[in-house]
Structure formats: C-alpha cells, structure tokens
Amino acid sequence: MKSGRRPRGFGGNIWTLVAAAFCLSALALMGAEKDKKKVEWDASKLAPASDKKGLTYEKDIKPLLEKSCVKCHSGEKPKSKYRMDSLASVIKGGESGDAAIIPGNSAKSPMVAYVSELVEDMEMPPTDKRDKYPALTKEQIGLIRAWIDQGAK
C-alpha cells in the first residue's frame, strides 16, 4: 500500500461508525419505549370497596387468590412472571416492572383492574380458563379493594 492512501472498505473514519452505532441504539430504545403501552382503565367502573375493617392478606385475601390466581401465578415459571403466592410478590407485580398493587390506592392498582375485567385482553382469570379458575365476584373484588385501601398488609 502506498503511503497516504486509505485502506479499502469502511474508509478509515472510526468516529462515523461510533456515531452511527449511537444513533441506531437510541432509535432502538425509543422503539422499545413506544411498544410498552401504558395501561389505563376507568376506575369509576370498579366494584365498591367493602366496609369490612382489619383485612389481612393471610386471613382474607390469600384464600381468594389461591382459588382463582395462584395455580398460574406461582412456581418456577409463573405467568407474566407475576407470583401471587406471597404478600410481597402480589404487591411487586410481574414482567411489566410496575407494582401490581399500590397500597392505599386500590383504584390505581393494576391487579384490581385486571380482576375487574377493565383492561382489554388482561381479564383475570382469562375467560377461557374460568371452568377451572372462577372469576372473582364483585364482593370479593370489594374485599381486595378494601384491603389495598387499608394499606395491603
């Protein structure tokens, strides 16, 4: 190769390559954020919270979840990576990274919206599994709401 000539191929400008890689990475991240939908629902359609006081996870809520939710949302590979077999995991949520329960605010807790069938394609339990796992009643949802509003303890 003669001195002063650029090698064949890319052209020798590494900074152009770095800038292009940076731009492509930024575009990929923007696309990923766009795909993550913000889930919204009309809280006015929720069943009213129960008047019952002193609700606890172990005594009042866990039995409801065991009947309708825990079979799919427990174990090594829970659906949507959301475990519902302990208080901490019920609150934490799953693969979305968002909390499923917001202690003190049942109307903004996604889990309540899902069991209330207010989010399309997120009805829980799924309608095609209701022969094995019954949907929660309005009264049961009201208990869950009251428990959350009381701090989800």
Task: Kindly give the residue locations of the regions a language model identified.
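Beta-strand-connecting loop/turn residues
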Residues: I14-W15, S80
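Aromatic- and Gly/Pro-enriched helix-to-coil junctions and flexible linker segments
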Residues: K2, L29-K153
